[in-house]
Design a protein with these regions (language model features):
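Conserved pre-catalytic core of RNA-dependent polymerases
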Residues: 1-161
Length: 161
C-alpha cells in the first residue's frame, strides 16, 4: 500500500481509465477477481485444521473498484429511497450496535404498551457464500439496477478464482 501511495501520481490516470472502462462496459476485469486464500486462525489447537477458516485476500485495485461501485450503488439506493431507516447494514452511522439498540427499544416500547413480543433470530453466517447470484441480480433489477450496471454485477460475480 505504501508503494502505491508513493506512485499514485504515475498510476492514477491509467487506473481511472480502467475503472471508467469497467463501469461503462459492464465488465469487472477478470485479473481483479483473483484472490489469495490464506488460513485465519480462530481459536483452540493451532495444529487442528478445523480451527482455521479461509479468507480471500484481493488486490488493492480490486478493493478500490469495489468501493467505487459500492459508493455508486449506495448513492442510487438513497436517491431512490430504497433503503429504509431500519436498514442498519452498509449505512453511515449505522452498525450492529445501532441495530441492537433499535431492537431493544422496540421490544421495550411493546412491553410498556402491554403488547406481546415474539423474537425470531436467524444465523445468517456465510450468507454471502450461499446466495443465489441470479436471485440477487433479479432483485437488483427490481430495484432499478439494470443494463450495464446489472451486467457489471453479473461480471463481478462470475469466474472468480
Amino acid at each position: 500500500m505504501v508503494v502505491i501511495k508513493q506512485c499514485l501520481g504515475y498510476i492514477i490516470k491509467p487506473f481511472v481509465h480502467i475503472f471508467n472502462v469497467s463501469f461503462q462496459s459492464g465488465i469487472f476485469p477478470d485479473q481483479m477477481k483473483r484472490a489469495k486464500i490464506k488460513p485465519l486462525f480462530k481459536n483452540g489447537d493451532k495444529q487442528n485444521m478445523q480451527n482455521y477458516r479461509p479468507i480471500s485476500v484481493l488486490s488493492v485495485f480490486s478493493k478500490i473498484l469495489e468501493k467505487l461501485m459500492y459508493n455508486r450503488l449506495l448513492s442510487f439506493l438513497k436517491q431512490h429511497h430504497i433503503l429504509t431507516e431500519t436498514q442498519h447494514g452498509v449505512r453511515e452511522n449505522k452498525s450492529t450496535e445501532t441495530a441492537s439498540q433499535s431492537f431493544i427499544e422496540s421490544v421495550q416500547e411493546a412491553l410498556d404498551s402491554q403488547r406481546k413480543v415474539i423474537g425470531i433470530f436467524l444465523d445468517l453466517s456465510k450468507a454471502y457464500d450461499v446466495i443465489n447470484h441470479e436471485t440477487l441480480l433479479n432483485k437488483l433489477d427490481t430495484y432499478g439496477v439494470r443494463g450495464i450496471t446489472n451486467n457489471w454485477f453479473r461480471s463481478y460475480l462470475t469466474r472468480r478464482s
